[in-house]
């Protein structure tokens, strides 16, 4: 499985050869530096650790600076491991957006936008308790009953209630690559991906 670390630029739309308007997301994908090579002999599994987006050295620990120095690179803001990388890579190698091709499908993982504390209507899509008139008072967006009284005399685990919404790790699978702009390290994928603008995402194929 190959992949890159990227940054969400934003959404736009393009026209295909049939004149159909397709919504798409632009991602700044790489270039990423190989900061560590995991091997079965030393680590018990095989993986590549990639670093993305330069970081100011004064915001890094000495241990982190020493780790990146071994790879011959500056400190990075985002570091991710990719297991079973498709191609053989060495420490310090640069991997760019050219590993992707137009027309293939990728998975994109990111942290969804945080919405704060939300009620059950927005968070879970509840319909409320019915009509807004005929004696109904202040219950339109209420969750309703969460369980019986004498038995089971408790609330079941997983009961959908109000709470903090968003800020979760979300993966969107099988997004088609519409365009690869190698000279600008841009990847254009069909549809939307999780996260706000300039948030980090992981692109896998």
Swiss-Prot record:
Keywords: Ribonucleoprotein, Ribosomal protein, RNA-binding, rRNA-binding
SUPFAM superfamilies found in the cross-reference section: Translation proteins (SSF50447)
Regions annotated as coiled coil: none
GO biological process, one term: translation
Molecular function GO labels: rRNA binding; structural constituent of ribosome
Bilayer-crossing regions: none
Pfam family, one: Ribosomal_L3
PROSITE patterns hit by this protein: RIBOSOMAL_L3
One Gene Ontology cellular component annotation held by this UniProt entry: ribonucleoprotein complex
Family that this chain belongs to: Belongs to the universal ribosomal protein uL3 family.
NCBIfam families (UniProt xref): L3_bact
HAMAP family according to UniProt: Ribosomal_uL3_B
Quaternary structure and interacting proteins, as annotated: Part of the 50S ribosomal subunit. Forms a cluster with proteins L14 and L19.
The protein's role, per its UniProt record: One of the primary rRNA binding proteins, it binds directly near the 3'-end of the 23S rRNA, where it nucleates assembly of the 50S subunit.
Protein name as it appears in the record: Large ribosomal subunit protein uL3
Source organism of this protein record: Flavobacterium johnsoniae (strain ATCC 17061 / DSM 2064 / JCM 8514 / BCRC 14874 / CCUG 350202 / NBRC 14942 / NCIMB 11054 / UW101) (Cytophaga johnsonae)
Lineage: Bacteria, Pseudomonadati, Bacteroidota, Flavobacteriia, Flavobacteriales
Gene: rplC
